């Protein structure tokens, strides 16, 4: 086996261990779906999940989800710089997602009802930041930058201000 093939295989093992869907792992590594399914079963002891990936507008559908996604996107921008608007870079995605998880663990109680963004949704957002399907918007009231989708399901406006208003 060539060094490049070993590297792609090791990357696939890491990404599957992190919970990335096989369609994404295949896209990133170029490995055949059958190889990835076999690898997934060997690593996880079960068949891989199936079904479509979420859309960015679905990920941003509620104010809380939009706020959580915005925290991830800000972490991703911090690790990837301005280049995230041109292309998705795997190291920046993984580093940004790890930072996001650290922040969530530090500030949200374990029994919190708020759903933590999973890595597949994070990948969708990173991909869509590169294509312009999602973008940052700065709030005119609190100055926080939050994530919006061009095809939005969530109401317009800042999710942080909306959540603060709701909790008063």
Where are these regions (language model features)?
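Long, charge-rich, low-complexity intrinsically disordered regions
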Residues: 1-14, 18, 22-168
